[in-house]
Amino acid sequence: MKRFILIITLIGTIFFAPAAIYPHDNPINAVQILWMNCRNFDEVEKSIYKLKMAGVNTLIIRVFQNRYDRFYPFANPPSPPFTTSPPPPSEGGDRGEVKGGMGGSGVYFNTSYAPVIDDILGKLVEIAHRNNIKIFAWMTTRDSSWLIEEHPDFLESIYDFKNGAIVKGERLNIFNPEVIERLKGVYRDLARYDIDGILFQDDLVLRHTEGYSNEARSLFKRDTGISADPATMYKNIYQKDGRYYVSLYTPYFWKWSEWKSKRLSHTASEIMSAAREVNPDLKFAINLYYETVSSPRDALAWLSQNIDELINHKFDYYAVMAYHRQMKRELGFSDKKIYEMLSTMTDSIIDKVGTSKILMKVQVMDWDTKASIPEDEIEMVSKFIKKGGDVNMSFVPVTEDTPLGTIKRLFNN
């Protein structure tokens, strides 16, 4: 009888204790690759083998080529060559993105929906799987240069504080059904490869002045009965150091931002469903800005990104861009406060989705200098993240200069 009671007790513990308490059995030890300094696939295989020996079991690799990204040296772009015009001066760019390189845009896999730079993905999958490494394709949505260049009419509309007018923006209008169909077609073709998953690029957001296309405003009016009029959204707009700021967002703005966050999640779901028509087992990860976890109200205002909305959709992983140096620069906090913030962020998102669905992304390159971050600093960041909970980790962006010995040690810990 005592043995029977013990068994029942154990079963109850297994099935009814909160999932977040338990460390997951198969942690993701990932690295994210923006560019590989390899001239051919033999060198690629050697590089991937080094990652394997460092304890890496998941490779997240860029499969898009935006206009100012660097080409993979082992790829063979079609002739005639793409434009080689230099990139424009940096204005901060997309946060965390390493810029530089030749012009031209497209993708690195076969599809009839986008220009193909070279079909290298199949070979990369083969090499990764031969080394027992899973591979996630890292792919864009709104910031897809190839579609923007082909269809300027697909550009979104934004509110220009300087002129007080709605003008054309720089990213795709996801409220245009044609844009969604093109993206769904690309992702379906991407899903035909033997990849293990897809990471959405961090462009699936709408900033506080974005989303004012005719289609978006019409849908918002239909869904809420409210007009998406910029004049009713912002109060006390002011200029400082050449930039415009908002002192106060109105109640209409918050309804607008909440609605935009739902539309973004709906767009992601449409794309995921299209890809899973081809491969039902395909995993999806969504990039989360650090504010989405640390300051949800700000993230909703600035990015229309809402973790509570996103967890209602079928994402397998939530990839938190916990880029400590970027956070320090933007927030003006001390190292100590940033480290404590990383622990709090980890603990906070564990409470929402559990440990196994979280991928905490650690910055290993300084975005401004392009230099590798010192080993002791990487270790300190990882230590404080792990204090928040036993979560999956990814180091971003890994290059030939990244200290793989340190990464191996951190994965083993």
Regions found by a protein language model. Name each.
Residues 307-413:
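Substrate-binding cleft of secreted/luminal carbohydrate-active enzymes
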Residues 91-96, 100-103:
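Glycine-biased, low-complexity coil/linker segments
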Residues 26-28, 136-193, 250-253:
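Active-site-adjacent "subsite" loops/lids of carbohydrate-active enzymes
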Residues 58-61, 120-165, 199-205, 281-283:
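Glycine-rich, aromatic-flanked loop segments that form ligand/cofactor-binding clefts
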